[in-house]
Amino acid sequence: MRAIFTSLFLLTTVLTMADGTELTPRARKLLHGRTVEVDLGFAVYKNRSARSIAEEIVANGVEGVYYFVTAEHAVRKDVIAELHKRGVPVAAMAIASGAYLPVDERPEGWEKYRMEFTNSRMDEYKFMSFVHRDYAIWMKHRIVRLINEYGFDGFTFAEAMYPITDGLERQDVLYGDISPAFQAAFKNATGDTVFPEFVDSAKPNYYKSIPKIYNDLVEFRIRTVNDFYNEVVNGEDGVREKCPGVFVATWTMGISIPNGVAKLREWEGQDIPSMITQVKPDMHFIQTHWPDWSNHELRGDYPLLYKPFLDLIKKTDPNMPIGFQTDLVSEPGARRPPDWQKLFYETCEQLKLDCTTYYIFCLRWAVYREPPQLCTVRLVWKDIVELCFDKRISNECGNIVLNRKMIVVDNGKSYSVISADVDGNLLKVVLDGDLSGATEITVDIGGIKDDPDYRLAPKGEVNIVPAGTFRKLPLQ
């Protein structure tokens, strides 16, 4: 059973975009179901065909993909095309601040857009600030080009925010943007003549001592985030105008702390009602914040703790579809096992959420902890069979199965492998006989293994299918 279902009534109310344009049939699929975040820059996607990547994604029951785009030159158009052949929609996901953009793909003179903070903790990242209209216009053209050139079905920004989390409550205070450009823009927009101080409580402009001005700053940050998002989506020559029929999702964080909605509004400039009202998305996502995903003790039913965020979406727009993003793997010690995932999906169904996604497909539990699972078998030619596994297998598997009596058909006749080739998660075997007419086969997959060299460190152990393991599957 799928964990996410959407009522027919809700579906029929959201197939038309905010500007009256209907979503394309493939883009509509992003409104519901289980999706994943994919970053094709990881080693596991190297030296294999685009078809094998698409087959692995589909073999895992994925119904939609959020393609995490950092370097535009590295986007795999061939993988997107292969997913489309299989009916899987692909949305582009970008970081709104451009934090991970390679220097050679940043706007000219990008340094003038850079956020500044009260300490050096964020210096390793290169966040660009939402206060700069020319940066928003540059990003708008970039996103439109990405969608149209690579054939994306949808688009979203992750982390359109000022990334300080609880920085105001730390001993070593973290706050931003405090760049001269941001301060000037704030004063110009509000008429305030001073900018708050966040570190030295003895100064007369310490933020707690000037609550009216500080509140102006809170509201100003929210406006800059929403204006940036809105410019990219609804501005002249933006996504709605230049990419008709494309799905658009807005995206804010959630967190399991008391008064979390108000705190993220204040801390990071994230305001669900105004973002939805201004940008008019097809769906709104809640992303799991790092204090939660890094918590090894986090329970799989934690979406219940995010209910204030979910309720606020429905209060803003009762017909707005809701997506929920979880993080299964960013903290190696908190890689979430199958029972945790099962509880998570059951909880999302209980909350009547429309869609889920997770970070990130290639680092999931099964890649590190489980032997390869055979998902489908396909007759390529009368004596050639392609075995599709749920993850990348070792290139040694071709030699492992060579000369093995590997396949038994319905009538009990067995066939040996005379040659074999590995392509990612696909194992193509040439047999010593004709399988034409067979409808179901039994496959000996004992000894099939994965390869830790393709994993992100810590790489873990080799996972091997135990000897004597057989799978009976229909022959497609």
Label every PLM stretch briefly:
Residues 277-371:
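Substrate-binding cleft of secreted/luminal carbohydrate-active enzymes
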Residues 392-419:
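Short, surface-exposed alpha-helix to beta-strand junction/turn motifs within ectodomains of secreted
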Residues 43-73, 149-153, 275-287, 347-357:
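Catalytic domains of carbohydrate-active enzymes, especially glycoside hydrolases
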Residues 80, 89-150, 202-215:
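Active-site-adjacent "subsite" loops/lids of carbohydrate-active enzymes
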Residues 371-377, 412-413, 435-438, 442-476:
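Acidic, Ser/Thr/Gly/Pro-rich low-complexity segments and short DxT(G/T)-type signature motifs
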Residues 381-402, 431, 445:
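A short glycine/threonine-centered beta-strand motif
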Residues 91, 156-160, 214-266, 287, ...:
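Aromatic-lined carbohydrate-recognition surfaces of secreted/lumenal glycan-active proteins
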Residues 99-122, 159-204, 261-263:
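Aromatic- and acidic-residue-enriched segments that line the glycan-binding/catalytic groove
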